[in-house]
Amino acid sequence: MTNFKFSLLACSIAFALNASTAYAAQPTNQPTNQPTNQPTNQPTNQPTNQNSNVSEQLEQINVSGSSENINIKEKKVGETQISAKKLAKQQASDSRDLVRYETGITVVETGRTGASGYAVRGVDENRVGIMVDGLRQAETLSSQGFKELFEGYGNFNNTRNSIEIENVKTATITKGADSLKSGSGALGGSVIFETKDARDYLIDKDYYLSYKRGYQTMNNQNLKTLTLAGRSKKFDILVVDTKRDGHEIENYDYKIYPNKQADLRAVGPTREKADPYQITRQSTLIKLGFQPNENHRLSVALDDSTLETKGIDLSYALRPYSTAGNEKYGERIINDQSKRKNIQFSYENFSQTPFWDHIKLSYSSQKITNKARSDEYCHQSTCPGVRNPQGLHLVEKDGTYRIVDKDNNDFHYKKDDSDLWAWGKELHNSKGKKISDDVDTKGGSLDSVLINCEKLDCSKRFRIYQEYDENSSEKYTYDDREIKVETLPNGKKYGKIPLKKGEKLFSQEEARFLFPKSHGYSTDFVNDRDLNTHTQQIKLDLDKEFHLWHTQHQLKYGGLYEKTLKSMVNHQYNTAANVQWWADYFFCARQEGGNLGGEKKPRPDISVAGCANGTLLHSDIGKDTYLIPVTTKNNVLYFGDNVQLTSWLGLDLNYRYDHVKYLPSYDKNIPVPKGLITGLFKKFKSTDYVYGKKYSKPDGYTDCTYDTPCYKQNFKDNLALLLRKTDYKHHSYNLGLNLDPTDWLRVQLKYANGFRAPTSDEIYMTFKHPQFSIQPNTDLKAETSKTKEVAFTFYKNSSYITLNAFQNDYRNFIDLVEVGERPIEEDSVVRYPFHQNQNRDRARVRGIEIASRLEIGDLFEKLQGFHLGYKFTYQKGRIKDNGLHPKYKEFLKLNKDQHPEYEAIARKPQPMNALQPTTSVYNIGYDAPSQKWGVDMYITNVAAKKAKDSFNSQWTSMVERKEKQYTDITDIKASKANGKEVKDSRGLWRNNRYTVIDTIAYWKPIKNLTFTAGVYNLTNKKYLTWDSARSIRHIGTINRVKTETGKGLNRFYAPGRNYRMSVQFEF
């Protein structure tokens, strides 16, 4: 394999170095005055990007022909375009597959909630822009404080939403600062998606129909996609409906447990198999266009998708799980959803004027909801809340309901001869076995139990058990009684069986229903949390081509106004789950307040078992939030000009102005807990009595306990200080120089900048706790980046090699910093350790990239259709501070004597975990001249992540140290990771070098039918990706392994050998 790699690389370099002599007599590529994306005033039966035929062919990536043609003159530095056809050929199904064969970009892994955006040039998630049809996608709550407090416990679906791959027309990946296109957030790069349009299919016909079925073994995913496109006179329509149904991605050694019982018993961080989830995605894309003439077009689009994940968090670290015999206590059931709905209206005009050749006005409304719901309850039949060891069940026979034993027979009472101390009679089953210990023979009185007539037929009789009649005579017998039907205030029917009254005052019978000695349900502790992003945007785009003196210009300009509301809703409540028949068919009759002697009223919200103490089946503490809702308003103006000065010299001049405003608000219906805000800026006075019981207030103090006017006023004052408006202004630019000194060499230089305004949670998040508190910071600066890049491209015809060197400089990185202990009241000895988001000084990433493709048919005529490809990325980077980072101050002060080496560790530049290890991707392929079949082999080689290039953000809490715990200084031993003591800041888990081979083939037996199949990880290599390794958490309850031994790491390994196949019919 090593020899092969060097021979392929040598072949590519040899081609580049000899291009000028081998093809000196060949004609050059098309001149650069050919427009690339120029809209036209053609009717709808023409393609939208109407250029010359040659330029159109060069721009597209032809994946079914013999070559993948790329117009070198139109290729931007650090930019890659991936077409729908290429994605289909590679059988891409998600964001991971989108970048599978790209280098220098990977997805961010989060475990249960899947991928969360991309990592490019040393930054990830919110620092890499994602856009779909011109709209920025939802950002994560990126505050490190939020991640420390909430993300690691699986209570939020804090990920960036993805897009359905079947809807994608083109995906443009830009590496390096790209705020020009994406605005705030594109520090390291951007991924911009454009969805399909009816005109893509209706170039030479009036209808198109496609049905695609696919399957992949790594997650048992079934794919169904129906695509319809049609045109009738002035109207055209496109419908793409896609459904994916599968389960979790199967890690290597997925079948490690011998059976289902062993699988379900393997719980906690040491679990070696991926947690079981059922994952479905439903996506619908509809576009309707109306073009009354060649100069005007109106369109409306709907892009609606839902990604849903259901399953069990078996690896959950703090799941309330224990075993006692065969009984189980507690399971964590999850139901996550990511919903995105975008409605867009647009008007286009193709009339040529002195100011534009094409103008487009669009309005978009996009709503994104990322939901994370967890239900923690015991759902087995052996759970304490539903125990029914005698198998009691309800039957109906001859018009009478009866509660019988597991043998369908009645019970009977008799004296317990086995117990000399027994008093009275005990309940026995039909086989004479005593069952009083498992059946409630003291509760279930007829006057406390009501029958749910919505679920049982109350016109029938019910067999009850009478112990004493109304005259206090012993009976211990059955009696079939009529059910008296009454109506609840909501109109629903219920039934009751009154106790018989005796002749004496207050005398009545003792009669009851016999139920199992358990509640009949498990208490379900529900966490239902939503992260909502609602964006409205008005955008105006114009472009114009013109000649000025001897120069050619492609001018693009416009602006937009965007308003985004970001909010969180936290809903916690308890309800009944795993409900059994005696809690489902019956409910409580209870006097108000639980008092005795009064009238008992129906309480359908209380079970029979909870009747005595009034325990509610469903208790709701209401909705609240940990983040105040924030509206972001963004005003944008942009200008870009592609200038061709001469046949060999061109300029790219681009500028954008952003003005971002944050407008925080407060919703009384979904409040922030008052305790998080009181005393935040304006402290309570030293004479204010805030914490403790009202009756314990000392003399001379003011009562400021919860809900007092004093407390409310402090909350109001601090809230006003928190709701400060903030704004950010930024000038983005992208300058490029394109040189074509010969017909085989192109030199490009790029200088660009980008920015990221702080997210609302980074500015406004507040939290107070004796062990971890967060102070808001409305003075944060925007993060910035600058990219310097140079590229040399040697090319001829469809073959090329690009050598690229880059440098990215980042400033003002936002990080969570420990700002020291602060009193929560004036002159108080009670001090909380506070943290705050602050700006760090700088970071730098440098690297080189190679991208090449060789059409072997250009060298040897007999080898037409064969091609070779090679991509390579190497990058290094560090975060640097001027001086010591503030978060280490207290730690070093405590440990300077015993561990002076820690200061050197704290002061050295910090490695950037978002940098991928050195990666190479080789491609060998063949496309038959008939375009009826082809095959590609991709070889991906990833180097090991070096220890010195990784960083453990928790190292100060893992090394041997002195630690302040409240007022005491304690010696803490070093934690172990994979059997070794942690001694420095190097990452705990890293990937080894690995090589993965994928083989993909397609076959078109007839024009309308395409088969595609692939074998992935052909050699069944066991490997761990760096992005999966760095997703493993040391604290929290999800994405954990047993740090001391490394047990559970197998759960994070990539799939072994797996297969994909698809079939597509097109008409």
Curated annotation (Swiss-Prot):
Subcellular location: Cell outer membrane
Membrane topology, as annotated: Multi-pass membrane protein
GO annotation, cellular component aspect: cell outer membrane
Keyword annotations from UniProtKB, A to Z: Cell outer membrane, Membrane, Receptor, Repeat, Signal, TonB box, Transmembrane, Transmembrane beta strand, Transport
One GO molecular-function entry: siderophore uptake transmembrane transporter activity
Residue intervals of the TBDR beta-barrel domain: 204-1067
Pfam families xref list: Plug, PT, TonB_dep_Rec_b-barrel
Ranges of biased composition (kind: Low complexity): 26-51
Ranges for the Sequence repeats: 26-29, 30-33, 34-37, 38-41, 42-45, 46-49
Segments of this protein annotated with the region Disordered: 26-53
InterPro entries assigned to the protein according to its UniProt record, in alphabetical order: Plug_dom, Plug_dom_sf, PT, TonB-dep_rcpt-like, TonB-dep_rcpt_b-brl, TonB_Hb/transfer/lactofer_rcpt, TonB_rcpt_b-brl_sf, TonB_rcpt_CS
Signal peptide range in chain numbering: 1-24
Coiled-coil ranges from the UniProt annotation: none
Ranges spanned by the short sequence motif TonB C-terminal box, renumbered to the chain: 1050-1067
Keyword rRNA-binding among record annotations: no
Stretch list, region 6 X 4 AA tandem repeats of Q-P-T-N: 26-49
Domain TBDR plug: 71-196
Keyword GTP-binding assigned: no
Short sequence motif named TonB box, residue ranges: 59-66
Role summary: Acts as a receptor for hemoglobin or the hemoglobin/haptoglobin complex of the human host and is required for heme uptake.
Family affiliation: Belongs to the TonB-dependent receptor family. Hemoglobin/haptoglobin binding protein subfamily.
Miscellaneous comment in the UniProt entry for this protein: This protein is subject to phase-variable expression associated with alteration in the length of the CCAA repeat region. This mechanism is called slipped-strand mispairing. Addition or loss of CCAA repeat units would change the reading frame and result in introduction of stop codons downstream of the repeat region. This may be a mechanism of regulation and a way to avoid the immunological response of the host.
Protein name listed in UniProt: Hemoglobin and hemoglobin-haptoglobin-binding protein B
